[in-house]
Design a protein with these regions (language model features):
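Short histidine
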Residues: 10, 17-18, 35-36, 40, ...
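Canonical helix-turn-helix DNA-binding module
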Residues: 57-84
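N-terminal leader segment of winged-helix/HTH proteins
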Residues: 1-31
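Basic, amphipathic "hinge/linker" alpha-helix immediately C-terminal to the N-terminal HTH DNA-binding motif
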Residues: 32, 85-109
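Residues within the helices of the helix-turn-helix
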Residues: 52, 71, 91
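N-terminal helix-turn-helix DNA-binding core of bacterial DNA-binding proteins
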Residues: 22-62
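Short loop/turn motifs at secondary-structure junctions and domain boundaries
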Residues: 18, 84-85
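C-terminal regulatory/oligomerization modules of transcriptional regulators
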Residues: 2-8, 104-162
Length: 162
């Protein structure tokens, strides 16, 4: 279990030190691992907000990796953790303004993969997203501002192995 007071010390020592001033290099320092953008996707598109929801998202992230990535994303200012419940011990994560700024990146990665790789995303969904980029991004921002956690994209079978 993670507590807000425990994270403060950990986060302070995990600052990103870019290898260069290149914007792509800096972006990859923050988001270039296998899991970070999937966590951002789950917050943004699926409305997930708890540790347990991320664990059950289907990609099979290990608990130690998830904890590490959540800490790194929080330290980078991409997500924030808030205490929830009567005692504040349960943590809910949400995107910051910096994090929701990744919406175009997530959308374009989804569309790129659908164009160039075999995915389980329905063709109709891909066509809708591709033809309505601006509206989809506007809706993403609206939901973020209103803390609307309903899934942006309807659930579909997203596990190729299942």
């Amino acid at each position: 279990m993670h507590f807000a007071s425990d994270r403060i010390t950990i986060i302070q020592v995990r600052q990103v030190h870019p290898r260069s001033g290149c914007p792509v290099s800096i972006s990859l320092e923050l988001l270039g691992d296998r899991w970070s953008l999937l966590i951002v996707r789950d917050l943004m598109v699926r409305g997930y907000q708890t540790y347990k929801e991320f664990l059950l998202s289907g990609e099979g992230i290990a608990t130690n990796i998830l904890a590490d990535r959540l800490q790194k994303l929080e330290a980078a200012g991409i997500i924030m953790a808030e205490g929830a419940g009567d005692d504040g011990r349960r943590i809910h994560y949400r995107l910051t303004e910096k994090g929701i700024g990744l919406a175009p990146v997530v959308l374009e990665l989804l569309l790129w993969a659908a164009r160039h790789e075999s995915t389980s995303a329905p063709c109709g969904l891909i066509d809708h997203l591709a033809g309505n980029r601006e509206a989809v991004l506007a809706e993403t921002w609206r939901r973020w501002r209103n803390r609307d956690l309903t899934p942006l994209i309807p659930p579909f079978r997203d596990q190729a192995a299942n």
